[in-house]
Amino acid sequence: MAETHFFPLTVASISPETTDAVKIGFDIPTACRNRFRYKPGQYLTIRSKLGGESVSRSYSICSGINDPIMQVAIKRIDGGLFSNFANDTIKVGDIVDCMPPQGKFSAELANGHEKNYLFIAAGSGITPVISNIKSILEEEPKSRVTLLFGNQ
């Protein structure tokens, strides 16, 4: 059963990915590290107060499981409350509430395995695929990954 409790996380990094998307990294407190251990392809539900209202959205983790910082990519959506906040307002040092990682879009990885993986993604749907590919290539260096990607 997925945990439904939110934990305060500090924004550790922000970097533009495109003209309408940012990558946001989080500092995970030592006391929460086990709860926030993630598998490739999982997502975070992030919550913040916007205009006096609590707004939460889910975003795919785009970092690999061995990356030093957990990151999500957030694409701006016209009229999107949280996506515009993330792209325009949020800054390093801000605190947002996050649920521990959830989701099952991942393969069980094991060092020494030699498998073939095929991913098909379009647009911002690439974010969980990036996490999977990075993790596969690190954990199973003999495996082969093929990506079919389409974008406007």
Q: Which residue ranges define each predicted feature?
A:
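Ferredoxin-reductase
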Residues: 2-95, 99, 115, 151-152
